[in-house]
């Protein structure tokens, strides 16, 4: 008789609002222009998969995952107290701010949900795509469900789901209005530091929103529009270190020994492969957009401790014909030239000299590819006492915006993983074939 299929049902064990473990300030806090940008009004969702630690479990060391993380979360919120607050509109300025109401007795707090699954992580392929368990079962959704207005005010929600093997998944929903990627990872790292027994957080958080420019008359473009946009297909591709080194070597040979990054190589290859697969007319204008960290341009010590939004969207423009027929080395050159413009272009934007152009605008135009590098944010280094995550799963609810996310591969093997949603279903095979072709 065939073995019964493993039970993958998620049981919610508890939900609560976690408050800072000590008293915290209650005065409202101003958000920067970039924090208040319309597309930041979203909860960014991700799953972080942690393998079991048999030696730790056998020795009975420490708390179980949910208890360890909940306890550390309450301690971390003493210094990161704005994350326990709520987004609100200032009565004075009419602008979005943080109402620091997360202290005990306040109406804030971080939603924390504990759940369990009776199967092992390996029974669900460690949550490789396609997910064997619905993402919404692993992400924190309080019950009863908040109204849209209530959810729009939330800043942070956490769920820890433990599996029968001792492994666990941490699901985060984090307001982009309060933290960008490096900022969110910084906070998660602080929770991990305390969960591992640390007495205090090594890098003290800094609010510091006044350092971020608020340009007079800064343009805010239209929001991405799903109407009329194509549905784009998900595809994850694991890339070997040999693959990356092959193209790095080509670049070095063509440039007299110059070096380029894995990000530059992989994004160049992805942009070219997508352009070829999409079969654009050669004269079609196409764009590559990617966020660059602006902390070194604005903040002392490179912005250590700052966790608000501090980035700039760089754009590389070309034609489909040029990108499709160029060598990967030449596409890398285009990207590197775009990156060099960061200091001057950011300075122009900060001075209000962009002449009606919104550099932060995200578009659903199929001709634009939006790429993100998650390998340098810090998520892959977060450790709650069981070691760093086996892998991190970025989640997107917008299947009409062409995206490509670079993450670290499973269990930190050499190489990288590309998580893409950038071509229509009928073009996925062509895109995949172009990506794996190293000629």
From Swiss-Prot:
Family as reported in the entry's similarity comment: Belongs to the plant acyltransferase family.
Consequence of gene loss (knockout): No visible phenotype under normal growth conditions, but mutant plants have significant reduction of ferulate in leaf cell wall.
Keyword Acyltransferase listed: yes
UniProt-annotated catalytic positions: 176, 383
Organism whose genome encodes this protein: Oryza sativa subsp. japonica
A GO term, aspect molecular function: hydroxycinnamoyltransferase activity
InterPro entries according to UniProt: CAT-like_dom_sf, Plant_acyltransferase
Superkingdom, taxonomy of origin: Eukaryota
Disordered: annotated span: 1-25
Gene symbol of the encoding locus: AT7
Region forming the signal peptide: none
Protein name: Acyl transferase 7
Keywords: Acyltransferase, Transferase
């Amino acid at each position: 008789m065939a073995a019964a299929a493993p039970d993958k049902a998620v049981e919610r064990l508890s939900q609560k609002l976690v408050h800072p473990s000590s008293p915290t300030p209650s005065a409202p806090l101003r958000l920067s222009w970039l924090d208040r940008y319309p597309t930041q009004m979203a909860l960014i969702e991700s799953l972080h998969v942690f393998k079991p630690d048999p030696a730790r479990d056998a020795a009975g060391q420490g708390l179980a995952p949910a208890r360890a993380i909940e306890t550390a979360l309450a301690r971390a919120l003493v210094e990161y107290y704005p994350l326990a607050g709520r987004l609100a509109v200032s009565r004075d300025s009419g602008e979005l701010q943080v109402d620091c109401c997360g202290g005990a007795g306040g109406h804030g707090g971080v939603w924390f949900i504990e759940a369990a699954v009776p199967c092992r992580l390996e029974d669900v392929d460690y949550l490789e795509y396609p997910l064997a368990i619905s993402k919404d079962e692993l992400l924190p959704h309080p019950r009863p469900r908040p109204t849209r207005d209530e959810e729009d005010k939330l800043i942070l929600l956490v769920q820890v789901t433990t599996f029968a093997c001792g492994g666990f998944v941490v699901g985060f929903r984090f307001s982009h209005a309060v933290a960008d990627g490096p900022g969110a990872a910084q906070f998660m790292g602080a929770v991990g530091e305390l969960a591992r027994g640390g007495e205090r957080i090594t890098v003290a958080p800094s609010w510091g929103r006044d350092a971020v420019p608020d340009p007079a008359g800064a343009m805010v473009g239209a929001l991405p529009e799903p109407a009329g946009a194509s549905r784009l297909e998900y595809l994850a591709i694991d890339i070997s270190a040999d693959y990356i080194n092959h193209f790095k070597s080509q670049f070095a040979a063509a440039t007299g020994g110059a070096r380029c990054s894995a990000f530059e190589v992989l994004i160049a290859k992805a942009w070219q492969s997508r352009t070829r697969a999409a079969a654009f007319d050669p004269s079609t204008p196409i764009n590559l957009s990617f966020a660059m960290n602006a902390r070194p341009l604005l903040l002392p010590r490179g912005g250590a401790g700052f966790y608000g939004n501090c980035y700039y969207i760089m754009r590389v423009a070309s034609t489909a014909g040029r990108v499709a027929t160029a060598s990967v080395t030449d596409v890398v050159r285009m990207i590197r030239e775009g990156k060099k413009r960061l200091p001057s272009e950011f300075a122009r934007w900060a001075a209000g000299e962009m002449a009606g152009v919104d550099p932060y605008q995200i578009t659903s135009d199929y001709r634009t590819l939006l790429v993100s590098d998650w390998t340098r944010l810090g998520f892959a280094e977060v450790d709650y006492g069981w070691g760093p995550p086996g892998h991190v799963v970025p989640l997107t609810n917008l299947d009409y915006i062409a995206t490509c996310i670079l993450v670290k591969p499973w269990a930190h093997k050499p190489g990288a993983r590309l998580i893409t949603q950038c071509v229509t279903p009928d073009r996925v095979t062509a895109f995949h074939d172009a990506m794996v072709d190293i000629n």
